[in-house]
From Swiss-Prot:
Function: Not toxic to mice.
Domain comment quoted from the record: Has the structural arrangement of an alpha-helix connected to antiparallel beta-sheets by disulfide bonds (CS-alpha/beta).
Protein name (Swiss-Prot/TrEMBL): Toxin Tb4
Location in or out of the cell: Secreted
Family: Belongs to the long (4 C-C) scorpion toxin superfamily. Sodium channel inhibitor family. Alpha subfamily.
Residue intervals of the LCN-type CS-alpha/beta domain: 2-19
Tissue and organ expression note: Expressed by the venom gland.
MF GO annotations: ion channel inhibitor activity
GO cellular component: extracellular region
InterPro entries: LCN-type_CS_alpha_beta_dom
């Protein structure tokens, strides 16, 4: 997946991964 950001669709706080 890709790195997520505080404003991504997943609502990640710091860094998360999603596909």
């Amino acid at each position: 997946g890709k790195e997520g950001y505080p404003t991504d669709k997943r609502g990640c706080k710091l860094t998360c991964f999603f596909t």
